[in-house]
Amino acid sequence: MEDFVRQCFNPMIVELAEKAMKEYGEDLKIETNKFAAICTHLEVCFMYSDFHFINEQGESIIVEPEDPNALLKHRFEIIEGRDRTMAWTVVNSICNTTGAEKPKFLPDLYDYKENRFIEIGVTRREVHIYYLEKANKIKSEKTHIHIFSFTGEEMATKADYTLDEESRARIKTRLFTIRQEMASRGLWDSFRQSERGEETIEERFEITGTMRRLADQSLPPNFSCLENFRAYVDGFEPNGYIEGKLSQMSKEVNARIEPFLKTTPRPIRLPDGPPCFQRSKFLLMDSLKLSIEDPSHEGEGIPLYDAIKCMRTFFGWKEPSVVKPHGKGINPNYLLSWKQVLAELQDIESEEKIPRTKNMKKTSQLKWALGENMAPEKVDFDDCKDIIDLKQYDSDEPELRSLSSWIQNEFNKACELTDSIWIELDEIGEDVAPIEHIASMRRNYFTAEVSHCRATEYIMKGVYINTALLNASCAAMDDFQLIPMISKCRTKEGRRKTNLYGFIIKGRSHLRNDTDVVNFVSMEFSLTDPRLEPHKWEKYCVLEIGDMLLRSAIGQVSRPMFLYVRTNGTSKIKMKWGMEMRRCLLQSLQQIESMIEAESSVKEKDMTKEFFENRSETWPIGESPKGVEEGSIGKVCRTLLAKSVFNSLYASPQLEGFSAESRKLLLIVQALRDNLEPGTFDLGGLYEAIEECLINDPWVLLNASWFNSFLTHALR
């Protein structure tokens, strides 16, 4: 246990715990569970205080560590962790300056916003019992009590939890992690059973006379004497307590806590129906680039100039024709829209000076494709509230779709390496403070593993498209602006390269609210024949626009070039998140860092170099019907990045719901694997909540399928 504590906790916390045990004459070599408990309590106190400040207006605010906070006052004064003399000096000073009542026992924190001392409790038992013990010991209504447990429960005075939900969730997650780490090392049972209650006067002395009578009178209802109450508390069974409480709430509620065994869970039911379709804002694995190397043309860097230069590299244009019509659209309009783009680009080239931006003529085909004048007129509610049959639009339930193999292929492709470099070394960004050697080393290793990854190309493509579209939406609200879809990269030899994927034409964009929609038509080059997987391209009209000569093992071959055209829409908030897709790099880097930290704590030294350079070692990547898939550390980096990127590309309410609900089932299964004997009630309700998120979204359906593979292998 001592080794675990030294690996698991910050050295400063370990040092403070050692001092505290020395001060109370306890041997940490013998009292190892107490050592762990003190460290945990210290860490919770520090996490409680972290990032919370009071601004100049006296309001409580949360500030992340990288923000400048020189003018801000810390919201909490930390008393726990100081030696007794210093701690009492701090308490006395607070009482003198704020007029707060001096507590009988040393509290853990002082809250300058609520002007109260706080006692933090961390328990391995039931929060209600521990709360009662704390309250009994302190006997002061002025000190606020906040109890956390290792199972994610909490209890606070008058249900006032002081902190925002996210800050408390950080603490609960950390406690859950400590518990899991202990369980995996076989230390949890001993630690859980070693907790002694708060020592109070009542426990040390036999109570007689008047005090005894008062104790008997002040018991909760249904208890005749103190002995009965003590016997009840000693034999308290939390599961039964929850059942009882629920049955009191309503006659309909009958929650029996059922043991969760290996045979309990069933697979998640995936919907039946036609196969799901591609719904990303731009093509992924099927996209085709027209590229120029070492661009040095006039106006290089201006999107329209770059686009025209890229278009000139291709000579195989031909009369376009529809090869896969859109089921519900007016397909000739899509064809005319592409012809209009070609014609207007031709017009630009004949001008003396190419303009920086191009607004398309408002032709009938573009008006149709962009939904111009299609939105129903908005009427003020007061003008029509007297209409008897006033009602909202009838909206059809979305049609259920089944999982299709193309989305797994898309994901596999996103994990692959390309022959281009998509991010520079500093793309993730330097730290403001002098960066530690280990942190920069990790970042450089990680960047090297993902810089060639196709998921990284999707990030840069997404950032560019969303930035360009948001800029155009604000700068040219009434215009049908032509926006080239461009990305920049380097070849393996380090030469710069500019790529054109196609074009977007933006519709009217008077975006007042974050969720107001701007319509756009996307036109993207591809070599994929849509007739191979027509269900994937349900929302597209696909044209054949040229023939491309490709080098192959047998010489040059000619392949038809297609243009995937569709009407789409997005909003300010979606574009804002799209512009920030680089965050995916950071998220996956942090996940890799936590793997390195876990390895380093076991080996008691930094394992960054070995982690990335030991090419013989394989790591678990994910579950498939075959079992646990393993791969190199580079493959792990790229898989984690691809997951993060797909979460961004396919963000939806279905994904939010599925992630939140399936996580609950995941935690229960993890608890079972850790031999924590979990119990559940209304497991059917949890499955219902998970399955109502499985409607038609390809990424959610794929995640559900992966979850089923995990269930199969986790419970063998």
Curated annotation (Swiss-Prot):
Q: Where is this motif: Nuclear localization signal 1 (NLS1)?
A: 124-139
Instruction: State the top-level EC class.
Output: hydrolase
Coarse class of the primary localization is: host cell
- Note accompanying the cofactor annotation: Binds 2 manganese ions per subunit.
> Where in this protein would one find the motif Nuclear localization signal 2 (NLS2), according to its record?
184-247
The record's section on Pfam families has:
Flu_PA (PF00603)
| Residues annotated for Mn(2+) 1 binding in this entry | 41, 108, 119-120
Residues engaged in binding Mn(2+) 2: 80, 108
**Keywords for this protein:** Cap snatching, Endonuclease, Eukaryotic host gene expression shutoff by virus, Eukaryotic host transcription shutoff by virus, Host cytoplasm, Host gene expression shutoff by virus, Host nucleus, Host-virus interaction, Hydrolase, Inhibition of host RNA polymerase II by virus, Manganese, Metal-binding, Nuclease, Phosphoprotein
Where in the cell? Host cytoplasm; Host nucleus
Gene Ontology molecular function: any one: RNA binding
Describe its PTM? Phosphorylated on serines and threonines by host kinases, including human casein kinase II.
Annotated GO biological process: cap snatching; DNA-templated transcription; symbiont-mediated degradation of host mRNA; symbiont-mediated suppression of host gene expression; symbiont-mediated suppression of host mRNA transcription via inhibition of RNA polymerase II activity; viral RNA genome replication; viral translational frameshifting
Which GO cellular component terms are attached? host cell cytoplasm; host cell nucleus
Keyword match Hydrolase: yes
Names of required cofactors: Mn(2+)
User: What EC identifiers does the entry list?
Assistant: 3.1.-.-
Q: What does this protein do?
A: Plays an essential role in viral RNA transcription and replication by forming the heterotrimeric polymerase complex together with PB1 and PB2 subunits. The complex transcribes viral mRNAs by using a unique mechanism called cap-snatching. It consists in the hijacking and cleavage of host capped pre-mRNAs. These short capped RNAs are then used as primers for viral mRNAs. The PB2 subunit is responsible for the binding of the 5' cap of cellular pre-mRNAs which are subsequently cleaved after 10-13 nucleotides by the PA subunit that carries the endonuclease activity.
HAMAP family hit by this protein: INFV_PA
Quaternary context = Influenza RNA polymerase is composed of three subunits: PB1, PB2 and PA. Interacts (via C-terminus) with PB1 (via N-terminus).
Instruction: Please give the family membership noted in the entry.
Output: Belongs to the influenza viruses PA family.
The protein here is known as Polymerase acidic protein
